[in-house]
UniProtKB/Swiss-Prot annotation:
Acidic residues biased stretches: 907-935
A Pfam family assignment: E1-E2_ATPase
Organism: Plasmodium falciparum
Region (Disordered) location: 901-938
Database matches in NCBIfam families: ATPase_P-type (TIGR01494)
Protein name: Probable cation-transporting ATPase 1
């Protein structure tokens, strides 16, 4: 493509392409008047109207026919006029031609743009409109594409890169010598000596001067010239290839050289262009003629593919033989396939406007070089992008509205009605024996009366009126008129955030950079207004004193002072002036050019060293193509200035220097003879002993590296920091001018390296010195900068460079154009753009009194310490070499900037370190760099700065992990939650040798970056946004936000504008994170985070909640966690960070009175793992930077909770990477697993919870859960029926065969079927409960967990593993062999507070209190519902159902008989809180609700089976194990077991009194919590058991038996419902304790439906357990004594006791919508209100998904018309808020006013148009039906209406009513009721048919009344005789006139008023 710069040459080819593609113009032929008239007449409705007029004329209705014809003709003429006018307007708008300079036939000439064909090369000029789709071959341009895309921001286009040239000169230098030398190098450098003669022939060939055809992009861009050959020439083949070059015989067989590796940069020319429109690939033919631009083109012909031969002269035979195969191979490599997104960078679309030209290259044509930019034509005419858009607009598929289709159907109904009337008329006439020809005309007349031809057009009248009203009143244009009716049915509105809900104008308010002291942390927010000089001065002074590599180099001053030519008399400086000396030197380093010019004479009079002959040259460096200016290094007579200073300083500054410091102080902080300005006489750093420094150095040594009396290792004994000589200074009393030139050589070194130049561009700003050398220091100068950017440029130079360069702005007509955000960022830097032909330079604007320090390239051979910075008055400038444009898909952009700083100034000085070892390393690196750069000049030794700007999430992925600050996510969350818009900037530095700018890939540029800082912008909300959102919501329209911004920023804006209600309790955020699975394959995992709403919490709790991401646990109880004060005293208080950090105790005291687990927490070991450092909390190095997402950051508090996590330790030993560590954080309680999402929703009002999704989560949900549906109500009943009657396997097959997409949890459906039939069932609650169970199953099947996670919760065996701190390694090795077993749980009671804590060796740490509970989960499924979900036939399932039945039966029927409590209704809880204060409870209702909740919910209670023997007595003594280990400090209370070490239990319990019974067994291997005396329970329940046994004996033969046996054959046992007594009030606890023991071990169960439902045939999957069931035999359930039933203590019990908060009059009943089938994806789609980080394609997918919802929702999209084009086109209506009318191409409506009121106006007018259309339709249809019935009645009495009557009815009455009905103004507010959108709907049909019946009823009544009147006489014979008389009709008028005028007009007006 690049090689087509010579243009087309074949005239035949040009003509063929003109015929094939047509002319390059969108020329539309307009139709003539006759054709348009014919189209109007051929309309079927107009034909029907002409037919009706013919019928009326035959029926003698001449006047009426003429009037209708006149009205119709006027309407047709007006329509034709508008059509012709629109056609001319469109033609003039699309027809565009301009003169074009095209290159054809080896010359350039001007032609019309309409004559261009694909393959032409033409010149692109400034301010021109591109006539066709063009590829840029050279240079770059800035385009305005607002016409096509709606993008108002200018777009920068670059030339198409040539991928074939992969090699460039490493020095980026390209010689401009003869082309002959370039081509000679190709062969001579790598060819053998034998080829010299042959190369001589090539030299002769290339020596010709006809080189004008060689011009191409390869020659245009100086960087693209041919380079060396990679591989050597094969001499063997050359020797074997014996060719006679003097032979003229062309038919001689030629040998081919196969191993000739020619240069990769070979270019291929082609003239034949083919464009494949399907894949967008540019394919060229005749690529074999690739070398014709290198040789004599006159002697080269085209390659003939048919014969595979080339016609060439004998002279070139050798060359073409050598290159034939290589050219073909290279041509295939150079065919690059570009995607649509990639080709957009290089393509200029037809119809776009050229704003400016850049990088114009020199092109040689006709021996003349001209600066031009060339483009290649690839598409013309209607094939172009603009042509396709025009095609779609002009010839689009007319989408017929449903209303139009419904009107046609309704016309069929009217035709049927007319035919029915015709049959009636025929029957009447035939019955009267009237056989005349007039009957046919009467029948046709009735048909014309019944069928109004204008009925379909009435539906479009309201549309046209609404569009005209929107255009005139509100400046809203409409592209698709039919969308106005759809706008009236919108019930969902999607908003973009930026530019739509918020203002377009952003404010740049500050930056956040890395902390200079600690690079791993970000500093606080630096507001722009807070950047004052005061803080700058302190940091500057500290750097000058403490930093030996400071820019204001003391060595530089000292060396210059030594080299001054001073006088023989040297005045000494006393000690009193020694400190003042340093201050004065600093103050005298002025850069005020104004002072220098104004006081030139005074300075010259006091100047020495005249014989040095120093010229007024510059002391500057050439920085990034910046111009050089003069700067002086001025030195003053110190003593003279001191004396003058004492005399002339005013009172306020007499004893102060710089406004703050005393006379003899150095830097305002030192005493008279102090060193370093801050410390006492012999102390340094103020913290160490008298003569010691940092506690590391000897007595008289400083910094450990210098001699005894030396300071900083480089100064003499009496020198101070290289600036002062303590006793003497060799200067005289006058000012010395020191002019430094780079080219001037002095005795001292003049070039030094500046290691810290990146950190600070120090600019000493000082005020004028008067002629008397007095200082004038205004105090306001120290308060603020003249320009705020000075602070950033001085202290953050890299950030300043990024702000100035990292953008896509352009300059057009001296005006900066581009994105608003980038304009703000660029204007802050006070820079300007200088755009030349081949450069894009950013240069700082000139300032009057401000000069910069700039760095120069020093002598590399000098060490880093011998550095030097020159004072220069040049302004900073940067050269942008390459830009990668911003892409919404990538969410970033990047630039490559050329800099002239030394290579040793790698910003990795920011790495830190002032250590000498690091400096030595830098010096070594510099030396290595010098070796590499020996061939280069110092002035050309550049490096490239790469800056990347984008979203914080993307930049974090691209940066090196070591360069990301630790508090990156914390700072990001902090400011995004405040609604700030944040951009991240990163950089990396690349040497010029290591990068090829022409072929560098974006992936290389945007990788391994270093984080630089955050840019903070504010985006204010539009003032009317909350009102508009509220108005839409109250009108029944759901509002959704879809934005590409950060999640927290989107939530903040959504709260502020009202999309998220302020009363919402919590916001649940869904996101997708990468998870490493098996074989180290990354998978995506959906996670949920809980984000609490601050406004709700503040309003209800009246407390200030920190707006951070909080977990469900939020904060631990500040008083007690484990019964003692772990958090009550200070965890981070006195003793952790105080004295005893690693001491004996955390809080200075023992927790629980003794050491936890017998050892110190921070002592030797905790569970065998060392936690002496923060990184070793988990036993291995753990870095918080490796958290998978920003929400996974964990605080130290949370990490402490998991230090005993056995699972984590085992996992962490496998892999220490963050990939496995992430599993720890995935189970944090703020990380809500997907299966737990509905656990939150099920207990809350759905209106109080909002869901927020990211773009990744949205796509994930769509792919994974789109096909899973909830069952219908009737399907639930059928499945329950199958479950009760059939077996499990059959049911599973039936369900799978029934519908594979339906997923049922058959175990729970029966419970829900019961609840569905309740009278006041809340649909929302039911939906969440069903959803909860379905999500459990789906997640389990989609994500297969690891075996150890599943086995942990399975009821398998009990292995009580102890932990001995002395044998940790042995225990760990044993644990690896064994599966995860159930551990002994310790229960410890806190008597001071009613709390109970379960400290398990594994994962469960539960904290229960009166008001809340905290459950820390470390696994996916911590509760026992996992068993219910995984194994339906498990023991736990059967046991739970058994207990459910037993508890319900016996507690209700037996226990209540002994209850004396009064029956009181359960009170409602006023507020959903965790305080459960209950009054007296109705026991029956309480137990019933408890048992009912237990049947279906996630509730898990503790069940223990204990012995039922008289010998079983639980004493208040201690309980020990058979094999036990206890600590000396172990404490055991009377009602519980408490041991600091773990207990080994072998299923045997011993009493302290050695009372042992083999039958006594505790099946659950945990302690039992009993309150009160157990004897009372046994006596109380003994009577119940006796009664029950009597009943069993009676019914023993006819009942099924339920048997529960243990492995040890214990005969008796009880099930105790163990509920915590400390979680309730006293009355509740006492009530519960009375009914502890529920039932005996063995019972006979009745054969009832409840039992049949739950106890059916099952097969156990567990080892050692079996299930069996049959009708004859008893059902036996064998319980293994090792089964662990309990995992969670009172998990959801309290929540399920709450009364539903939903008001029954608000929530929907399930019976109203019971047949809705809802998928999981649709369920979340309905409840989600905010979508963040959405890409443009994601937005369109969201809108399409919302449109597919089953309730026929209509979705609207509102955007700014730039990034939302795809979403706007996919929506039912698209509303673009843009200033440009042309952007309406991608949206249905365009508002010129950037105001959200346009949305309300469009919806109002849409609803008004819909209502008006329906009203007019009903009015016209009823009018025609009534008129038909009226005429039929008159015909039955042999009468009819006259002409005047028809004219009066149709024209005078009906026509004005229909016109004024449509012009009725719309309402000013949106109503709550959305109008009906279908004609065939029940209300409209009832209205029409009801009116027909009513009018017929009144007509019949009126006729009966008329016939019964006395004056009415009807003689049939007389009428028949008078028919022939003309006076017949007039005689009948006195009857018909009354009827027609009074009755019919009354009916018409009545209908109109009724409809109004």
């Amino acid at each position: 493509m690049h090689l087509m710069c010579t243009g087309l040459r074949n005239e035949k080819l040009i003509n063929d392409r003109k015929i094939l593609y047509g002319e390059c113009n969108l020329n539309i032929k307009s139709d003539s008047f006759i054709i348009l008239l014919f189209k109007e007449i051929m309309n079927p409705f107009f034909i029907f109207q002409i037919f009706a007029m013919i019928v009326w004329s035959l029926d003698n209705y001449i006047e009426y026919t003429i009037s209708i014809l006149f009205i119709t003709s006027i309407s047709i003429i007006l329509e034709l006029k508008n059509t012709i006018k629109n056609q001319k307007k469109i033609k003039n708008m699309l027809n565009y031609t301009c003169p074009i300079n095209v290159y054809r036939y080896n010359t350039s000439y001007i032609i019309s743009s309409s004559e261009l064909v694909p393959g032409d090369i033409y010149e692109i000029k400034n301010n021109m409109t591109i006539p066709c789709d063009t590829i840029i071959l050279s240079g770059s341009v800035t385009m305005s594409e607002h016409m096509l895309t709606g993008e108002s921001v200018p777009i920068h286009k670059e030339r198409l890169p040539f991928e074939g040239n992969a090699i460039i000169n490493k020095n980026n230098k390209y010689d401009s010598n003869d082309e002959k030398d370039d081509y000679l190098r190709i062969y001579n450098n790598h060819a053998s000596i034998n080829m010299i003669k042959r190369n001589h022939l090539i030299e002769e060939t290339l020596g010709k001067k006809d080189r004008e055809y060689k011009s191409n992009t390869h020659d245009l861009c100086s960087m693209n010239k041919l380079c060396y050959i990679n591989n050597t020439y094969d001499d063997v083949h050359m020797k074997n290839n014996k060719m006679d070059y003097n032979n003229n015989n062309n038919n001689k067989k030629k040998k081919k050289i196969n191993n000739l590796n020619f240069v990769k940069g070979t270019y291929i020319n082609s003239n034949d262009l083919l464009y494949d429109d399907k894949i967008g690939v540019n394919i060229f033919e005749d690529d074999v003629n690739n070398m014709k631009h290198k040789f004599n083109q006159r002697n080269i012909n085209y390659y003939n593919k048919d014969t595979n031969n080339l016609e060439y002269n004998n002279k070139h035979r050798y060359i073409y033989d050598c290159l034939l195969k290589k050219v073909e191979a290279i041509s295939q490599k150079n065919k690059i396939i570009y995607s649509n997104e990639d080709i957009n960078k290089y393509m200029l679309y037809g119809g776009t406007y050229v704003l400016s030209l850049y990088n114009i290259n020199k092109i040689k044509y006709n021996n003349k070089e001209e600066n031009r930019i060339l483009g290649l034509v690839i598409k013309t005419g209607f094939i172009t992008t603009k042509g396709k858009i025009v095609n779609n607009i002009l010839y689009h598929k007319k989408k017929e509205l449903n209303l139009i289709n419904d009107s046609y159907k309704f016309l069929i109904i009217l035709i049927i009605y007319a035919l029915f009337s015709v049959f009636i008329l025929l029957y009447i006439t035939l019955s009267n024996n009237e056989y005349t020809n007039h009957i046919i005309i009467k029948c046709l007349d009735i048909i014309t009366d019944a069928i109004p031809p204008a009925l379909p057009t009435t539906l479009t009248v309201g549309i046209s009126i609404a569009i005209s009203r929107l255009k005139k009143k509100f400046s809203i244009s409409c592209l698709c008129p039919h969308k106005i009716n759809i706008a009236g049915q919108i019930n969902t509105m999607v908003f973009d955030k930026t530019g739509t809900l918020t203002e377009n104008n952003l404010q740049f308010i500050g930056i956040i950079t890395q902390n200079k002291k600690n690079k791993n942390m970000l500093s606080d927010f630096i507001h722009i207004k807070e950047m004052n000089t005061e803080s700058y001065i302190h940091s500057k002074d500290d750097n000058m004193i403490h930093n030996k590599n400071s820019i204001i180099s003391e060595y530089y001053i000292k060396d210059n002072m030594k080299n001054l030519h001073t006088s023989s008399k040297k005045k000494s400086i006393t000690k009193e002036r020694s400190n003042f000396l340093v201050q004065t030197i600093k103050s005298c380093l002025l850069k005020d050019h104004y002072i220098k010019e104004k006081k030139k004479e005074y300075y010259t009079n006091n100047t020495y060293c005249n014989d040095l002959h120093i010229n007024d040259s510059t002391c500057s460096s050439y920085l990034l193509n910046s111009e050089t200016k003069d700067a002086y290094c001025e030195y003053y007579n110190i003593d003279h200035l001191c004396d003058i200073n004492k005399k002339n300083m005013d009172i306020n500054s007499k004893n102060e220097l710089m406004g703050k410091y005393s006379k003899n102080e150095l830097m305002g902080k030192t005493i008279k003879n102090e060193l370093m300005g801050k410390y006492s006489k012999n102390e340094l750093m103020g913290k160490y002993s008298k003569n010691e420094l940092m506690g590391k150095y000897s007595k008289n040594e400083l910094m450990g590296k210098y001699s005894k009396n030396e300071l900083m290792g480089k100064y003499s004994k009496n020198e101070l920091m290289g600036k002062t000589i303590k006793n003497q200074v060799g200067v005289d009393t006058n000012i010395y001018h020191m002019n430094c030139d780079n080219d001037y050589n002095y005795d001292y070194p003049c070039d030094y390296n500046c290691n810290n130049c990146n950190d600070t561009y120090h600019r000493l700003e000082y005020h004028n010195i008067n002629k008397d050398n007095s200082f004038n220091i205004p105090p306001e100068k120290n308060k603020s900068y003249n320009n705020i950017s000075e602070h950033i440029k001085i202290n953050y130079p890299l950030l300043f460079e990024a702000l100035a360069c990292c953008h896509t702005l352009s300059k057009v007509n001296n005006k900066i154009m581009g994105d608003v955000l980038e304009i703000l960022m660029f204007n802050f830097t006070n820079c300007d753009m200088l755009i030349n032909n081949n450069s894009f330079i950013i240069k700082e604007k000139k300032k009057n009194c401000s000069y910069d320090f700039q760095k120069i390239d020093g002598d590399k051979n000098i060490g880093a310490n011998d550095e030097r910075c020159h004072l220069n008055n040049n302004l900073v400038s940067y050269n942008i070499l390459k830009r990668f444009e911003f892409q919404s898909r990538l969410q970033r952009m990047s630039v490559i900037v050329k800099s002239t700083y030394g290579n040793n100034n790698d910003d990795n000085n920011d790495d830190d370190n002032n250590n000498d070892d690091d400096n030595n390393d830098d010096n070594n690196n510099d030396d290595n760099n010098n070796d590499d750069n020996n061939d280069d000049n110092n002035n050309n030794n550049y490096y490239y700065n790469i800056f990347c700007k984008g979203s914080p999430e993307k930049i974090k992925e691209l940066c090196l992990k070591s360069k990301i600050p630790n508090n990156y996510d914390e700072i990001l969350n902090k400011y995004t939650k405040q609604g700030m818009r944040i951009l991240s900037i990163s950089y990396k530095r690349v040497k010029s040798k290591n990068i090829n700018l022409l072929n560098v890939k974006r992936s290389f540029v945007e990788s391994n970056l270093h984080f630089l800082g955050f840019l903070i912008f504010t985006n204010n909300m539009k003032k009317n946004a909350p009102d508009i959102i509220h108005n839409l919501q109250t009108s029944g329209c759901q509002c959704i936000m879809s934005t590409g911004d950060n999640v927290l920023t989107s939530i903040h804006v959504a709260k502020k504008c009202g999309i998220i209600n302020s009363n919402v309790e919590s916001i649940i955020i869904g996101d997708v994170i990468p998870v490493v699975g098996k074989n180290n394959k990354q998978k995506k995992k959906l996670v949920w985070y809980n984000h609490k709403n601050d406004t709700y919490l503040k309003g209800h709790d009246k407390t200030c909640i920190d707006n951070e991401f909080t977990s469900i646990q939020s904060q631990m109880n500040s008083d007690n966690i484990c019964g003692d004060n772990i958090c009550g005293d200070n965890i981070y208080g006195d003793n952790i960070c105080g004295d005893n950090i690693y001491g004996d105790n955390i809080n200075g005291d023992n927790i629980n009175g003794d050491n936890i687990y017998g050892d110190n927490i921070n002592g030797d070991n905790i569970n065998g793992d060392n936690i002496n450092t923060y990184d070793n909390i988990y036993g291995d190095n753990y870095n918080l930077d490796y958290c998978p997402t920003e929400y996974h950051k964990c605080t130290y508090n949370n990490s402490i909770l998991y230090r005993n996590n056995f699972l984590y330790k085992k996992e962490n030993k496998k892999d220490k990477n963050y990939k496995n560590i992430s599993t720890l954080y995935e189970h944090r309680t703020n990380d809500i697993q997907f299966d737990k999402l509905c656990d939150i929703l099920i207990n809350k009002d759905p209106r109080n919870v909002n869901i927020v999704l990211t773009g990744k989560a949205f796509i994930f949900l769509k792919k994974k859960f789109y096909s899973f549906h909830l069952p219908y109500y009737e399907e639930c009943k059928n499945i329950v029926h199958y479950i009760m009657k059939k077996k499990h396997k059959k049911i599973k097959n039936i369900i799978n065969n029934h519908n594979s997409n339906l997923y049922y949890h058959y175990n729970i459906i029966d419970t829900f079927v019961k609840r569905m039939n309740k009278e006041y069932m809340c649909f929302n609650k039911l939906l969440y409960k069903i959803q909860q169970k379905l999500l459990y199953n789906l997640i389990h099947n989609l994500y297969k967990k690891k075996k150890y996670m599943n086995n942990y919760y399975d009821i398998d065996e009990v292995h009580l593993i102890g932990n001995n701190n002395n044998n940790n390694n042995k225990n760990n090795s044993k644990e690896k062999k064994l599966p995860l077993k159930n551990k002994m749980k310790h229960i410890r009671k806190n008597e001071s507070n009613d709390n109970i804590t379960f400290n398990t060796y594994t994962s469960n740490n539960i904290h229960l209190s009166k008001y809340k509970y905290v459950h820390h989960k470390n696994y996916y499924y911590p509760d026992s519902c996992t068993n219910l979900r995984k194994k339906k036939n498990s023991l736990f399932y059967n046991l739970k159902k058994y207990i459910y039945y037993e508890k319900k039966k016996y507690l209700q029927h037996c226990l209540l008989k002994h209850d004396n409590y009064k029956k009181v209704e359960l009170p409602r809880i006023k507020d959903i809180n965790y305080s459960y204060q209950m009054e007296s409870i109705k026991t029956r209702n309480f137990i019933h609700s408890l048992s009912e909740q237990f049947a279906f919910s996630n509730l898990i209670l503790s069940f223990y089976i204990i012995k039922n023997d008289d010998n079983n007595v639980y004493n208040k003594n201690y309980i020990y194990n058979k094999n036990y280990i206890y600590n000396k400090n172990s404490i055991c209370n009377k009602n519980y077991i408490c041991n600091k070490n773990y207990i080994y239990n072998k299923n045997n319990i011993y009493n302290k009194n050695n009372i042992y019974n083999k039958k006594n067994i505790l099946t659950h291997a945990k302690s039992v919590l009993l309150s009160g005396s157990s004897k009372k329970f046994l006596k109380f329940f003994s009577n119940i058991i006796r009664r029950h046994k009597l009943k069993e004996k009676k019914n023993k033969k006819n009942i099924k038996r339920y048997k529960m046996n243990h492995v040890n054959n214990t005969s008796k046992g009880h099930i105790i419902l163990n509920m915590c007594t400390h979680g309730f009030k006293k009355d509740y606890s006492s009530l519960k304790n009375k009914y502890r023991i529920v039932n005996n071990k063995r019972y006979m169960l009745k054969n009832d439906n409840v039992y049949d439902r739950h106890m059916y045939n099952l097969t156990d999957m567990y080892r050692g357990t079996q299930y069996g069931c049959s009708k004859k035999k008893n059902k036996n359930i064998y319980m293994n004594n090792n089964n662990n039933i309990l995992k969670n203590k009172i998990n959801r019990f309290l929540e399920h006791l709450l009364v539903d908060k939903c008001k029954r009059n608000i929530c929907h009943k399930y019976t109203d919508i019971k047949n809705i089938k809802l998928s999981i994806y649709e369920y979340i789609l309905r409840t989600c209100t905010v979508y963040a980080r959405m890409k443009p394609k994601d937005k369109s997918d969201l809108i399409l998904s919302l449109k597919k919802l089953p309730n026929n929702s209509y979705v609207g999209m509102c955007g700014d018309g730039a990034n939302d084009c795809l979403a706007l086109s996919c929506a039912d209506i698209g509303i673009s808020l843009c200033n440009n009318n042309e952007s309406s191409i991608c949206s249905s409506f365009t508002s010129n006013k950037l105001c959200l009121h346009s949305i309300v106006h469009i919806l109002i007018e849409g609803r008004a148009s819909l209502v008006n259309s329906f009203q007019l339709f009903k009015f016209i249809s009823l009018y025609s039906i009534m008129q038909c019935s009226q005429v039929l009645i008159l015909y039955s009495i042999s009468n009819k209406l006259t002409d005047n009557q028809y004219i009066f009815i149709d024209i005078v009455t009906i026509l004005p009513l229909s016109i004024f009905m449509c012009w009725t103004s719309a309402s000013e507010k949106l109503s709550k009721n959305i109008p009906i959108g279908k004609l065939f709907s029940f209300p409209i049909l009832i209205s029409i048919y009801g009116q027909i019946i009513i009018q017929l009823f009144f007509v019949m009544i009126s006729l009966v009344v008329l016939m019964n009147l006395s004056f009415y006489k009807y003689d049939k014979n007389k009428v028949m005789k008078e028919k022939s008389d003309d006076t017949y009709l007039y005689k009948a008028q006195k009857y018909t006139l009354i009827y027609s005028l009074l009755f019919s007009k009354f009916v018409y007006v009545y209908i109109f008023k009724y409809k109004e």
